[in-house]
Amino acid sequence: MPLFKFAIDVQYRSNVRDPRGETIERVLREEKGLPVKKLRLGKSIHLEVEAENKEKAYEIVKKACEELLVNPVVEEYEVREL
């Protein structure tokens, strides 16, 4: 069966605070003197999936996101094929 590679980019929804991102943003601006206007953290998950075709592989990745990898209440995600 073919192997498909995906990256899932996850970050907080825009209406959810990102305390770690806010702290890093403040340190870069105030302590390091860098002109950082806005910083938000996220995570990237890389997955390799065996499936019959690309569409089935994408369905598997989407199911993994919805059931475990992403908290839809506070996070949003985007899937990219690698």
UniProtKB/Swiss-Prot annotation:
Any one GO molecular function term: ATP binding
Enzyme class name: ligase
InterPro entries the UniProt entry points to: PurS, PurS-like_sf
Keyword Amino-acid biosynthesis: no
Reactions performed catalytically: N(2)-formyl-N(1)-(5-phospho-beta-D-ribosyl)glycinamide + L-glutamine + ATP + H2O = 2-formamido-N(1)-(5-O-phospho-beta-D-ribosyl)acetamidine + L-glutamate + ADP + phosphate + H(+)
GO cellular component labels: cytoplasm
One of the protein's GO biological processes: 'de novo' IMP biosynthetic process
Keyword ATP-binding listed: yes
Pathway: Purine metabolism; IMP biosynthesis via de novo pathway; 5-amino-1-(5-phospho-D-ribosyl)imidazole from N(2)-formyl-N(1)-(5-phospho-D-ribosyl)glycinamide: step 1/2
Main location: cytoplasm
Its EC number(s): 6.3.5.3
Annotated compartments: Cytoplasm
Subunit structure: Homodimer. Part of the FGAM synthase complex composed of 1 PurL, 1 PurQ and 2 PurS subunits.
Family: Belongs to the PurS family.
Name recorded for this polypeptide: Phosphoribosylformylglycinamidine synthase subunit PurS
Top-level taxonomy: Bacteria, Thermotogati, Thermotogota, Thermotogae, Thermotogales
Gene that produces this protein: purS
